[in-house]
Amino acid sequence: SEEKQLVKYFKTVIEPKLKEKDLEYYLIRNERIPELAIYSFSAGERFEPDFLLFIKKKNVSEIKSLQAYIEPKGSQLLLQDAWKEKFLSQIKDEHQITDLLGHGYTILGLPFFNQENRMNEFSKAIDELVNQL
């Protein structure tokens, strides 16, 4: 499944990049937890991305943290769920953090993880994400 492939990709490609930069990180599988649902900006459609990736810089005086939504998607569902990928791409620019802890905290969505059709986009997004920390 795409979910298993994502975990393998994380262990072999993403994790070494995070370790190289000495970043603290957690990849969390969202098992249909209602509190982790997000809603599209345009129509309020409910969406529960399969994975959340939390990354934090260690040992810095200024806290810099990042939360990324990751959605593995089988090729047969790419067109049907295109609205979800569009929504994920809007999160970084559209989100608003209203908590006092929001300073230095970034939320974003990544392109769908799909080994057949989306690896270039996904890999590029991961590299950009890691490089900004």
Q: What do the PLM-derived regions correspond to, one by one?
A:
Residues S1-L133:
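Electrostatic, structured charged patches in enzyme active sites and in nucleic-acid/phosphate-binding
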